[in-house]
């Protein structure tokens, strides 16, 4: 899985695992008497913030997104997630069934997570251009600031941000909103494919 390229291991916490090499070495130096050596378990210390576009044109990609989410939960000890619809505005949510009732202000999300989080947006980037560029462009909420401003806040706050697009790359140039988002992301939009994921993880791990 391409996510494994985004690894930075650290030994943290109380959980321990067998240090096989040290156990063999210590046992040999102990006259053959078993001398078990333990070491703190290695954890992937990379911090990841996943933001998924849900609903509408993203429905055909639900299974792909679920697989990505499951893989990320296994791979990263520090993984947080939020949902948005079409584009990021001033509110995000974690329970899509309560998207109108339990919305977290995006500004609070930005305050909650440090610059060292690797941010991964997942969405098809297909929408009316005014949904990105205009106040009130959201089809779900009344957004006072254009979505483009909010995406800029993410790219300025976090050290590394990428956008994974499940739509085949050959179609991107035909969608104006996709081209706008590519520009806002400084071309750090990648296909949600093995090759695209490898490219995205290589960038995030620099």
Language model: regions and residue ranges:
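Acidic/polar low-complexity segments with low predicted structural confidence
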Residues: 1-46
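A short, conserved beta-to-alpha structural element at the edge of catalytic cores
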Residues: 73-95, 149-169
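Von Willebrand factor
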Residues: 80-120, 126-129
């Amino acid at each position: 899985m391409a996510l494994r390229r985004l690894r930075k291991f650290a030994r943290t916490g109380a959980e321990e695992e067998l240090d096989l090499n040290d156990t063999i070495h210590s046992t040999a130096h102990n006259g053959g008497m078993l001398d078990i050596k333990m070491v703190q378990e290695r954890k992937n210390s990379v911090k990841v913030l996943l933001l998924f576009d849900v609903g509408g044109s993203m429905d055909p990609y639900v299974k792909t997104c679920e697989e990505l989410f499951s893989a990320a939960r296994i791979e990263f000890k520090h993984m947080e997630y939020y949902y948005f619809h079409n584009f990021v505005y001033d509110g995000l949510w974690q329970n899509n069934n309560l998207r109108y009732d339990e919305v977290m202000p995006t500004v609070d999300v930005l305050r909650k997570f440090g610059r060292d989080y690797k941010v991964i947006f997942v969405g098809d980037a297909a929408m009316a251009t005014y949904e990105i560029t205009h106040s009130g462009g959201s089809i779900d909420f009344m957004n006072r600031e254009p979505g483009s401003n909010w995406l800029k806040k993410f790219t300025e706050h976090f050290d590394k941000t990428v956008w994974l697009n499940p739509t085949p790359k050959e179609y991107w140039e035909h969608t104006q909103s996709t081209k706008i988002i590519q520009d806002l992301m400084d071309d750090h939009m990648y296909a949600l494919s093995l090759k695209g994921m490898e490219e995205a993880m290589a960038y995030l791990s620099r």
